[in-house]
């Protein structure tokens, strides 16, 4: 790793199944886990721009990893804009082709807002899950966001567009947005249907059979019946047409995946509104364990689990359940401020890295 966040240069060999990165807050533990997640998924949940990821003295950041002893992955971020991805020394024309060998599931203290936070947080979580299962999904999200921006720009320029051209412009947008929206809705719906029984089982276990969890997908378009693409596409086109007057008044699109909501129901009550803080944290834990299980099941191998300062936010009982659930199956990288809370067995079987040494040494084993 070169020129990434607060790291000028770092070479780290992660040999054990359990890895503990220990050190005070603000020293760069989260940056290390973020770099691994970025290389595995091409996304950072902590930064909106690559500019935020590049060391302030550098013009580029370079991430490299060897996964499964065979796959060499590289991602270069440039301050002037643009990325370059390489796999086994070959420059990739599509960044998405980097995804696969280093699948990760991240769980940080920020994820604890998943239940009580805004709908956008649940959409982003669901999108990360779908992308792990179908890397091409990122293209759909990018296409939809671009169409949404262009449509908003169209409304801002509406008065300057000749009247005879307006309907044809909107018709063209409706066709494209309906198609992309349908494909996003279908993938989100399928992913939630797969996640729900797993999350429900984990919630039942974590609550000692006291709580029943349901995941209720509420698409931002009015959709009925089976997930067939053509009926859903036509339904969305019809809704976009019917909403034009309202859309013109508001200057924004009211139909589509950007309006989706995922309701999390505990014993048929909305966890966001009626769940206690402890119940909400249990729901997040159940969702993350379900995600970990689903990605491993559908992708054929257990993903790397990144636990970023999250154990300190869980009570001892939930900490123990999480660490037991991870077991020996997953390689797990955990950041924490201290070793308290980790069982002696976990510490003895873990590679322990002092975070304070990372910036002073080029190579840590």
From Swiss-Prot:
One of its GO terms (biological process) is double-strand break repair. GO terms for cellular component: cytoplasm. PROSITE patterns: RECF_1, RECF_2. It comes from the Bacteria. One of its GO terms (molecular function) is single-stranded DNA binding. Pfam families: SMC_N. SUPFAM superfamilies: P-loop containing nucleoside triphosphate hydrolases. ATP binds at residues 23-30. It is found in: Cytoplasm. Keywords: ATP-binding, Cytoplasm, DNA damage, DNA repair, DNA replication, DNA-binding, Nucleotide-binding, SOS response. Belongs to the RecF family. HAMAP family: RecF. The RecF protein is involved in DNA metabolism; it is required for DNA replication and normal SOS inducibility. RecF binds preferentially to single-stranded, linear DNA. It also seems to bind ATP. This is DNA replication and repair protein RecF. It comes from Prochlorococcus marinus (strain MIT 9313).
